[in-house]
Amino acid sequence: MKRIVVTGVGMINALGHDKSSFDAITEGRCGIAPITLCPTEGLGTTFAAEVKGFDPETVVKKKEIKKMDRFIQLGLHAAQEAYDDAGLDGIDCSGFGVVGANGIAGISTYEAAVERKCDGAMRHISPFLIPSYISNMLGGHVSLRFGMTGPNLTTTTACAAGTHAIIEAYKTLQFGQCEGMIVVGSEAPISPVCMAGFGAMNALSTRNDDPLRASRPFDSERDGFVMGEGAGALVLETLEHAQKRGAAIYAELTGFGESADAYHITTPHEKGRGAKKALNAAWKMAGEPQIGYINAHGTSTRYNDLYEAAAIFECFGDAPFVSSTKGQIGHTLGAAGAIEAVISILAMQRAILPPLVNYRESEPEMAPIKLVSERTVSSGIGAVLSCNFGFGGTNAAVVFEKFSL
């Protein structure tokens, strides 16, 4: 088996435009506020975790902006940071591949086109419409930017897409299809229809009078998730290739797990069956290391948090620290796995664990996992796990360990 390592990371979220946002996350700050990106009239939820002050011209030329939805722009921003962080500038990256990830893709662009149809303006539909919003164009733009001619894939497995993208990159490298991969999960789902759709499912928090305290993973008073946007990116390479070019190494990807609940289209299995299977598979593949920290899916919804806690406890007991950063940056859907993998890796590298903001206490029936209620310094963590679950009952988990020869 080839050893697969992480040599670069990047992210953009509601608390910042690069990996330095990790500091804001560990300080317990929250990026949730009233929505400014779209009209909120008639919506049951009027707040979200928006990326503030993002200027797409920092990533693409002005004339190119109209050719890509915001989710592509955010993804390119994170990808550029990971590319630079990995020291790939000036290196021939034609042997690299790309895996993009999203769940909703360019929904805002699509909504705008539908509005034009309703207004009778079909003749004014842009020729760039389709390539500006379809899901695989994130990976397409990344490969174009960096000249990466290896496999170009896209995962669209709802909220597990980012984690599945990491797994697909691992598999591609193991099979020798290329020497490096860049994984980019990105989402820009804050639109009227998207907010209304999730609201109709009673999936969103409705604490419009208190947005900062709305997302409260594992807390007994949680009432739904908070929509978020952003992107995360990781550069993965075979150890041989990374060493050959003298790359700095963040962590080693040692295990992954995938499963399906086969239970319900949106509700997780009541005993955490699929989640447990994915968690256990990732841990077993990694060689059963001592997991020191888990960045949980932790959506702040009634059932996910309850059943996920049960799965974690059954697999690992109360040994690992557990938190969910969705309390600060919202639920970024298909981007969550990539963003949270970056956060998990940085937590292990810097020995600082992100706290659960807004957490007070869990309901009595929740499994007694070791929740991180405040910023925690823990230097003894050698392995971390990040997991995500999506509609359709799809589950994915990955294990990263500190790198050593």
Describe the role of every protein-language-model region.
Residues 119-126, 167, 171, 188-244, ...:
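Glycine-/small-residue-rich "gating" segment that lines the acyl/pantetheine channel
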Residues 1-6, 93, 286-290, 367-405:
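Flexible, low-complexity linker/loop segments at domain and module junctions
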Residues 177-223, 256-270, 296-305, 319-369:
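Acyl-CoA/ACP chain-elongation machinery
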Residues 6, 19, 29-157, 186-195, ...:
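Conserved beta-ketoacyl condensing-enzyme motif
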Residues 1-64, 240-252, 342-356, 396, ...:
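ACP-dependent fatty acid/polyketide chain-elongation machinery
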Residues 8, 25, 79, 98, ...:
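Conserved small-residue
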Residues 2-7, 29-34, 209-293, 405:
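Condensing-enzyme catalytic core mediating Claisen C-C bond formation in acyl metabolism
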Residues 75-87, 135-187, 225-247, 332-353, ...:
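Active-site-proximal alpha-helical scaffold in enzymes
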